[in-house]
Design a protein with these regions (language model features):
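Conserved phosphate/ATP/ADP-binding segment of small-molecule kinases
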Residues: 4-102
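Conserved post-catalytic alpha-helical subdomain immediately downstream of the catalytic base
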Residues: 78-83, 108-172
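Hydrophobic residues at beta-strand termini and immediately following loops
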Residues: 105
């Protein structure tokens, strides 16, 4: 679920998603239209939460908390979720799971031209890995690859496909 906070996803829809989803991945975004009113804590449970640092700060109510403390302690206390990813921009991402300690996965972007859609690409690429039981390192790695590809595209001029992700991963692993 990419929840942009424009009112499309009502509390009753969230309740239904939490009750009926086989796997629920959530990115509740803060933006200029909803800033402060579309927190991930609207979702009482999820299988994977993926949000950026400002969104996490709003959700835990702390302007200065360290990213690893947010992802490994404060967010798990605020939402019933076994896996949480906090995207850190140039810093990559911090991952946490009940079965794993907090880990950092580096960013892979070489050129940044536009940030629009990077979090959406991250979630779209990483959620399937989480759904089939991937490790947090694997989930964060694939998500960061997708995010790196997306920040190299202005707006929505083109999309990211499987071939681009596979090619990028192959290049990184050489």
């Amino acid at each position: 679920v990419n929840d942009f906070g424009h009112g499309l996803i009502a509390p009753s829809t969230i309740e239904l998603l939490c009750r009926r989803s086989k796997f629920l991945a959530v990115n509740a975004q803060s933006n200029s239209a909803n800033f402060g009113f579309n927190l991930v804590t609207r979702y009482p449970c999820a299988d994977l939460v993926c949000i950026d640092t400002p969104e996490a700060r709003l959700a835990v109510g702390s302007k200065f908390m360290d990213a690893s403390e947010m992802v490994g302690r404060a967010l798990p206390a605020a939402i019933n979720c076994d896996r949480i990813i906090l995207t850190l921009g140039r810093g990559g991402c911090s991952t946490w799971a009940k079965a794993e300690d907090v880990q950092t996965v580096p960013a892979f972007a070489k050129t940044v031209v536009d940030l629009v859609g990077a979090g959406d690409a991250f979630l779209a690429a990483s959620a399937p890995i989480a759904a089939v039981g991937g490790t947090m390192q694997q989930i964060g790695f694939v998500g960061n690859v997708a995010g790196a590809l997306k920040v190299g595209i202005v707006g929505h001029r083109s999309s990211i496909d499987r071939a681009a992700i596979v090619k990028s991963i192959s290049g990184l692993l050489k």
